[in-house]
A protein has these predicted regions:
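RNase H-like DDE/DDD metal-dependent nuclease/strand-transfer catalytic core used by mobile genetic elements
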Residues: 2-102, 106-108, 112, 203-210, ...
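C-terminal, beta-rich DNA-binding module of retroviral/retroelements integrases
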Residues: 115-219
Length: 219
């Protein structure tokens, strides 16, 4: 949690997309949903070279904004970097674990100490558990139907991850196969925006059809 530094979840499993999403589901069930999630650019989180990831779609399906740190700028995630540093100094550098089960047990014990017993100067010498506030957004693990605002073109993504708009065949991502996206003119310049649910996911040049960026933002 950004404001309180409370460690909501430590998942000690092989780092795959399904494990990551399941870990977030468990965290959301227990602590509620945030308005946004900041992550690094690991392949399970960000799909810059190959469209979009299932993790990004999972967040957007639950009205959570995916945010990625700038590449090669770890200071964007300064708090989590310090968290990792503390974990290494206090636990990982001094222990060899027989397997993931042993590692998980040790990490959960360390997490409890970090949250409940360790004061932080930035928190007025309080512990993260003393200042953390549970989110009121309940996670139901159910994707609610979404109705796009009328007046703009809505197109279904084909089985290769492409959509045809005007005279352009545009690649979005296999992640959105059989999903519907909406095209809107950009009021600020000669381009159009591609929206998934209530998020802008890409911008294309209206003249050339060239993608300008694939940056997710709220509509």
């Amino acid at each position: 949690d950004d404001s309180s530094r409370y460690s909501i979840k430590i998942a000690c499993f092989p780092n795959t997309k399904n494990v990551v999403i399941n870990a977030f589901k468990q965290a959301f069930y227990e602590f509620g949903m945030p308005s946004s999630v900041l992550s690094d650019n690991g392949s399970q989180f960000a799909g810059f070279k190959h469209g979009f990831t299932m993790f990004e779609k999972f967040l957007m399906n639950n009205d959570i904004l995916p945010i990625h740190c700038r590449i090669k700028h770890p200071q964007t995630q300064g708090k989590i970097e310090r968290f990792h540093g503390s974990m290494k100094r206090e636990l990982l550098n001094h222990n060899l674990f027989k397997n993931l089960d042993y590692a998980d047990k040790a990490l959960q014990e360390w997490r409890t100490k970090y949250n409940c017993l360790r004061p932080h100067e930035a928190l007025g010498n309080k512990c993260p558990a003393d200042v953390y506030t549970h989110s009121e957004r309940i996670f139901a693990d159910k994707v609610e139907p979404f109705e796009y605002e009328p007046g703009f073109k809505v197109i279904k993504v084909n089985s290769w991850g492409y959509v045809r708009f005007q005279n352009f065949q545009l690649y979005l991502s296999e992640t959105f196969i059989n999903d519907y996206v909406q095209f809107r003119p950009n009021p600020n310049n000669d381009s159009f925006l591609v929206c998934y649910r209530n998020f802008v996911i890409a911008e294309y040049d209206s003249s050339s059809g060239k993608r300008i960026h694939r940056k997710i933002s709220r509509l």
